[in-house]
């Protein structure tokens, strides 16, 4: 069975990098550019994993996670948070995400580890 991922990031480069990484590992991938768009996509798809940026226009990653946790149909989706070091300054750690990836460190290596942690499976 093919796993489905939803990648949410306003940076085209990051979105492309993460989507390509997942597609190369057999995932079906959908993407959105912000939290509002992601919530719309989630009306149509049911991903096995959601990977979201922390800082985005319209609705940021923290707000998106809050919305996801409110609804039984999305509350159990494993979440990997993409964050720049600057987005963490002055904010508590995002304890509602299953893993965090720092954008300024090797994303591919971190993605492999985060997927293993969030899904408990080999990548």
What are these regions (language model features)?
Residues 31-49, 110:
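Acidic, metal-coordinating helix/loop segments flanking the phosphotransfer/catalytic sites
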Residues 80-82:
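Hydrophobic/aromatic residues positioned on beta-strands within the core alpha/beta folds
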Residues 46-48, 73-78:
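His-Asp phosphorelay/catalytic-motif detector in bacterial-type signaling
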Residues 56:
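Receiver (REC) domain active-site loop signature in two-component systems and cognate sites
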């Amino acid at each position: 069975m093919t796993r489905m991922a939803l990648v949410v990031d306003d940076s085209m480069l990051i979105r492309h990098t993460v989507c390509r990484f997942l597609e190369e590992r057999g995932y079906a991938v959908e993407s959105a550019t912000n939290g509002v768009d992601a919530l719309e996509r989630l009306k149509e798809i049911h991903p096995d994993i959601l990977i979201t940026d922390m800082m985005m226009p319209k609705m940021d990653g923290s707000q998106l996670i809050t919305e996801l946790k409110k609804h039984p149909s999305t509350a159990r989706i494993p979440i990997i948070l993409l964050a720049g070091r600057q987005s963490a300054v002055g904010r508590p750690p995002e304890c509602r995400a299953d893993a965090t990836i720092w954008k300024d460190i090797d994303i591919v290596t971190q993605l492999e580890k985060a997927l293993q942690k969030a899904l408990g499976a080999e990548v």
